[in-house]
């Protein structure tokens, strides 16, 4: 049985991975790799509607992949480095496991 912290970590990774499953969200993530953005920036650069962007932002926020900060009436979004580190750590563990694993017939 999984330890509780391990189970929570896997649930978090699962949510994060789902957030990568849409090409529009990947496009939004690419924009955030250059720094924080507001919805109006995303609209200009992607030609997506405000409602569609808000939908994708909601999914990215719920997954913990992005954070936001409000400045006056504007909300700026940026990537959550802790979540990116969690994904990187998990993928690294997968590659380490597969490279160190012995084949069944060896």
Residues covered by each model-derived region:
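Amphipathic alpha-helical dimerization/coiled-coil segments
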Residues: 1-12, 81-106
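Residue-level detector of secondary-structure transition/capping positions
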Residues: 36-37, 61, 92-95
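Alpha-helical residues within the helix-turn-helix
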Residues: 44, 55, 61-62
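Juxtamembrane/interface motifs at transmembrane-helix termini
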Residues: 48-51, 63, 75, 97, ...
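N-terminal helix-turn-helix DNA-binding core of bacterial DNA-binding proteins
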Residues: 11-51, 71, 75-83
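Short acidic/polar alpha-helix capping motifs at helix-coil junctions
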Residues: 2-6, 38-40, 53
């Amino acid at each position: 049985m999984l330890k509780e912290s391990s189970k929570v970590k896997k649930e978090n990774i699962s949510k994060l991975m789902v957030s990568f499953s849409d090409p529009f969200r990947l496009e939004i993530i690419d924009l955030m790799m250059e720094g924080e953005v507001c919805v109006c920036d995303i609209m200009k650069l992607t030609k997506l509607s405000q409602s569609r962007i808000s939908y994708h932002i909601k999914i990215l926020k719920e997954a913990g992949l992005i954070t936001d900060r409000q400045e006056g009436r504007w909300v700026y979004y940026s990537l959550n480095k802790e979540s990116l580190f969690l994904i990187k750590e998990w993928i690294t563990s997968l590659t380490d496991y597969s490279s160190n694993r012995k084949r069944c017939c060896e």
